[in-house]
Amino acid sequence: MPSNSVLHLALFVPWESFLSNMQGDITKIWSGYENTLSNRLRFYVSNISLLRKSAEDARRDAKLWASRSEGDDTIDMDIPLDEGDYGQEPATMAEHHQYYTALLQTLQNAVHDSDATRGSPVLQGLIQDLHQENPVEEGRSFVQRHDDFYQQIRCDQNGSLYGFPSLSGDDIQAVVKAQGMLHLRMLDEIESGLPNNTYGTGNGNTEDMLTGFNDAEIPFPRQGQNLVTAQTQVPRIFVDVGPETAFVELGRLAASKKTLNNLQNMALQLVCRFLDKYTADPESAGQHFQYTGGQAGTGKSRVVDALKDVFIERGQPHLLQITGTSGSAAAQIGGTTVHSACGLDTRRSSNQPLSFSEGKKWMWKQKLVLIIDEVSMLGGATLYEISRHLQSLRDCPDKPFGGIPVVLLMGDFYQFAPVLETSLLVNKLLESSLSSVGQAAISHHRGYSLWQMFKTVVILEEQIRARGDPELRDLLDRVRNGVQTHQDLQLLNTKVIDRSQITFRNGLRAITPLNRNRWSLNMEAVVDWARFNKRHISIFISAHTWRNGTLSLEEIARTIDQGDDSSCKVPGVLFYAQGMPVVVNTNIYTGLKIVNGAEFTAVDIIPDPKHPGYHLADDVTIHFGPPLGILTQSRETEGLNVPGLPTGTILICPASHTLDPRHPHFKFLSTKCSRRGLPVVPAFALTDYKAQGKTFAEVLLELRGNHMSDSQPSKCDFTSLNIQLSRCTTLQGIKLLSPVRSIDFIDNKLDKRMLDAMERLQDLAAETKRRYEG
């Protein structure tokens, strides 16, 4: 834009260098000078380029962002642009003392009342340090850290942002906008299967790609329009030239490359055989519905990877659609959520007509294979909605799933079931009379009927995760079959570890279904890990804005003490140390795999000047408000190049959540409260749900239920028992936080309906194997 070029010339180039130049285009003049700027000036230029988006553009981006919501794991953050003070007055020193007292109360509760951290020497040591440096009873003012404190910390700890210009609020806005646009571009690439060669995670053109993103629609060829004359700003159509290799042959090569075992190879070849049949004669081939299951650690994702290689070798990755029922499941296999891919909208009535863009419909009509992973979380009603949407997307209302040639469901029904729906394995109509059936039951039954069409079944059996430990492998088999013994119980109880021996210094992870125990364990773990590794500890109290009324110290303390859970993604207090593992609590950037349950390393923090740090101990600083953001990285972000950030990192910013007295967890509140903080927490301790799909060398387990009854944990859920025990690679690596009760282990198995359904799947798997081998 010419006005931008004038502005850039005026700001970054000596005027005498260009005022005499009366010829040529102003943009070309600026481009010539831009290439000569220093890296520091180019950093500011890129931020200004990103910030030039108008408010109207931002609203358009927000609408597009909303259209990418992920079903049950919806993006529950607004576009995180830090545009003001959120209506908060600066906190007084008296309020600081209230929150500090509340923090101490939380720590003392963990030491005295929590089964998980009772008597923790690590937390007792921290409490002692805080009392020594800042006695509550004296009420003296906190000593504020100097302005360059975190720069010094970065220097001492080799922080990722050391040497980078300090990021202002405007810089944060630019980074967030860049990440949001990159997320949408990546999501388009994942959903379409077409690699966009105009940018790459490690390429220097990322800034140009981001600056121009969303400035125009990408037209798709309409019915009757010649593909050659279709005008597109970005090339989105690939033409395959040369002979195609058969799917079966490429499947053999992929299986050899991935070293698939016999059952994995069968799962792959069943799909490849059908695809060869379909490409030879689409009209007579029909459709192929396949379920590939198996317990955790049997290598289901390797089948997906091999099938992905087959399509890549054919030059047709865009014909394969990979999805998961949750953001984390999708991210683990390189896909997107099925809600996003199929345009599922939890707010749309089933009676409303479906409407999709011609571009999205055109994309879906090309697809040969749809993969849906983590099928245990897929309810019957959602499966029916997927089929209904695909019928509309593919303009094929008379065939299941819109006539897509292959639908491949993956997952383990011994893992967690749908939260708000009923498992595909359950026929609800058997449990109620037809006269009393509601719309939800009807939708589920339609999905259940679709599920009954999946008669090609492969159950993977070879335990890859625990194959080096036959004793653990046999134990897991007995647990899945519900025949675990008292001898197994005695064996597990030899794994109980004394409280004084629990340390998180060397990579130990904990899994507990009880949120309160998780909060306490994570506080202990951060302090233990940070002090052992000589890392500074920063404590961020989330900002709380009360609607009205005078609050007691007890009410403030209970609010701070209530951490994150499934209904509140923001913790009351965040303990941070550079290099610690963190887990994300909500879907933020699905295209960049920043999703609910995804794990990252926290490599730096950007404090908010409005919430300065105060000295609590030589290695402990407290902030009475959230930071501007936390900088994270993982293997998934390697090579990612966001303007303004170190290569390979992504910034996560604060989110807001309303605490409502009507919610069971916040009944103690006298009025509503808005909490603002980071939607991430330390990942030393995880819930059983977020541990699903992860593997650890050493793990501390709590085989209990997920709520308290009469001051005792409820019975351990079978799914939790199965998932926790199968997270480790060896029996030696398993440690127990507390003894396993008989009620938690003996006769703990799936209910009869599920067992009967699993028996049917085993029969279908045997029949499938006979057909395949015959």
List each model region and its residues.
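RecA-like helicase/translocase P-loop NTPase motor core
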Residues: 229-774
